[in-house]
């Protein structure tokens, strides 16, 4: 990737819904090029925090910085397109009427990149995620794992400074999840992109992340370093 990755700083951020606190005074840092997993049970605030980072919600208090720029506070919030983000969702979010190549090239099209260069970049990115030759296919013809690779290629093609993942593998079976999480880790290391990876699965967090932030009831319980050792999914699931 040619665009430099950026650090992220979350400073005393809180958020509530209908006056019920969801996130409580969260503060943490993510180094440029680091992958941080957000781990915790359903309802602990993982996806809410990701939405704040993405610009889909605004903090009630505190600040979020990307690089040397405050992108969100109680007073202002930059929209997602102004934050140099790429996003990968649980449901893939592919357009069924578009080909695989058109889906991957869409962020480049929105930036005004010409047809030929964006097609070339889309083909190159599909090759990087192991889908060379899939350009003309429609998403409906692909398996779940292949669709998630297309979603990852689309997120990476515009060279984002930060990637946000919202439980991207939770709809897939165990063996496929293990294969894909190792592939995603390799791509993140190769690209050097800063990433935030939401999951409820400790195995995924241990494999893909440099560190894991453990959330419970909207508060940080701990931030742990991944072992760095070769790791496989637990047998007992």
Say what each PLM segment does.
Residues 3-175, 187:
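ABC family nucleotide-binding domain
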Residues 82, 192, 217:
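ATP/adenylate-binding site constellation spanning eukaryotic-like Ser/Thr protein kinases
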Residues 177-191:
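Helical segment within the ABC ATPase nucleotide-binding domain
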Residues 192-198:
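Conserved H-loop
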Residues 200-203:
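The feature captures the ABC ATPase H-loop/switch
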Residues 205-207:
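A short, surface-exposed alpha-helical micro-motif characterized by mixed small hydrophobic
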Residues 212-225:
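H-loop (His-switch) and adjacent beta-strand-loop-beta switch element
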Residues 231-237:
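ABC ATPase nucleotide-binding domains
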């Amino acid at each position: 990737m040619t665009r430099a990755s950026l650090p992220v700083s979350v400073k005393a951020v809180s958020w509530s819904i209908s006056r019920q606190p969801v996130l409580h005074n969260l503060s943490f840092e993510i180094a440029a090029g680091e992958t941080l997993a957000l781990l915790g049970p359903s309802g602990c605030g993982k996806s809410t925090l990701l939405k704040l980072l993405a610009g889909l919600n605004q903090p009630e208090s505190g600040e979020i910085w990307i690089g040397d720029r405050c992108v969100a506070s109680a007073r202002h919030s930059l929209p997602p397109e102004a934050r140099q983000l790429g996003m990968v969702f649980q449901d893939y979010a592919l357009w069924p009427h578009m080909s695989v190549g058109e889906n991957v090239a869409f962020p480049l099209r929105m930036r005004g990149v010409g047809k030929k260069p964006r097609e070339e970049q889309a083909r190159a990115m599909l090759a990087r995620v192991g889908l060379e030759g899939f350009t003309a296919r429609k998403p409906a013809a692909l398996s779940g794992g292949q669709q998630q690779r297309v979603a990852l290629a689309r997120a990476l093609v515009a060279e984002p400074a930060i990637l946000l993942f919202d439980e991207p593998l939770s709809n897939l079976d165990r063996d496929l999840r293990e294969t894909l999480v190792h592939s995603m880790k390799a791509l993140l290391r190769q690209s050097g992109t800063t990433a935030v990876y939401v999951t409820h699965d400790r195995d995924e967090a241990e494999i893909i992340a440099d560190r894991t932030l453990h959330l419970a009831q909207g508060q940080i319980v701990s931030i742990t370093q991944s072992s760095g050792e070769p790791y496989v999914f637990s047998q007992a699931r």
